[in-house]
Every structure is written in structure tokens, then in C-alpha cells.
Amino acid sequence: MLRITENELSADLFYELYISVGWEPPLKEQIAVALNNTIAAFTVYDDNNNPVAMARLIGDGGMSYYIKDFAVIPTEQKKGIGTMLMKHIENYIIKNLKPNWAVSLELISSKGKEPFYEKMGFEARPCEWDGAGMFKMVRYTN
């Protein structure tokens, strides 16, 4: 049976899961800082206690949450793990909301993965209310 843990994701495990999906990883020191400043980090383990997915939830805790580093290892994709993890994240947010609160939940999809997120209720940008999402990497220079 799959199991999800909260806030037990180490920098080393993050690194392993990150590269498993073909992403160029940040430095482990940078990962550790990011994890330390994350609202919640989620790790999914399979029946054999092998890590198969992760995600981080960042944001202000009041009006806006952002899903970052949502990754399911390629051999375990299309098995419902991502759906289970996304539902877990949404339930985590809901149980931490105050009465009458509504918050935005945002993310940037990997190319080609948009249908998964749309199935989970996310709306692509631009749309009727919003323009295109924007992205910029800022790098250290001396």
C-alpha cells in the first residue's frame, strides 16, 4: 500500500527524485535551504518502502499556495500516484484553512503534463481572468 509522509524529505532524497524525472538539480545546500523554508514537503513510498514521488508546498499560508517540485519517478507514472499525491496536498491545505477562506493553488506544469493538472482541476493560463503565467530564473553574479 502506498504511503505519504509529510516533512520528512531529506536533501539527498529530494536530489534523487529530482534527477529521476530528468531535471537538472540544484546544489544540495540550496535544496536544504528550500526544504527548511517549505510549508510542507510530501514523499510517497511504495509497498516496499521505496520513494516514488515527492512535492513541496510553498506560499504565504493565507491567500496563496504554490506546488513546487511535483515529481513521480518515470517507472511509476500513470499508476495513480500523482493523483493521490495531489489530493493529499489539497486536503492538507483544506484542513489548515479557516472558515470562509479560499486560497489560490498554483503551479507550473512540466511540458506535456498539462492534461494531468487540468484533470485535477487546474486551469491553463491565459484564461478569462488571467494573463499568461510568467517565469524568470535569477542567477548569482559577482
Language-model-detected regions and their locations in the chain:
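Conserved acetyl-CoA pyrophosphate-binding loop and the N-cap/start of the following alpha-helix
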Residues: 76, 80-88
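Short amphipathic alpha-helix that is part of the acyltransferase structural core
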Residues: 1-29
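Conserved acetyl-CoA binding element of GNAT-fold acetyltransferases
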Residues: 63-74, 78, 132
